Amino acid sequence: MAVHKYYQLSGETIKARKPICPRCGNGVFLAEHEDRMSCGRCGYTEFKK
């Protein structure tokens, strides 16, 4: 997937479209699953309520 699809431009600000992994930092996003969000790099998982 192209990098420009991960960010949203509005005026002069850039915002990430997906949540960023708190362990890995900027540039690594959490994949959204039906019941959780997980990082493919470090394995960090957040479960949805």
Swiss-Prot record:
A zinc finger (C4-type) spans 21-42. Keywords: Metal-binding, Ribonucleoprotein, Ribosomal protein, Zinc, Zinc-finger. Its cofactor is Zn(2+). One of its GO terms (cellular component) is ribosome. GO terms for molecular function: structural constituent of ribosome; zinc ion binding. GO terms for biological process: translation. Binds 1 zinc ion per subunit. InterPro entries: Ribosomal_eS31, Ribosomal_eS31_arc, Ribosomal_zn-bd. Zn(2+) binds at residues 21, 24, 39, 42. Part of the 30S ribosomal subunit. Belongs to the eukaryotic ribosomal protein eS31 family. This is Small ribosomal subunit protein eS31. The lineage of its organism: Archaea, Methanobacteriati, Methanobacteriota, Stenosarchaea group, Methanomicrobia. The gene is rps27ae.
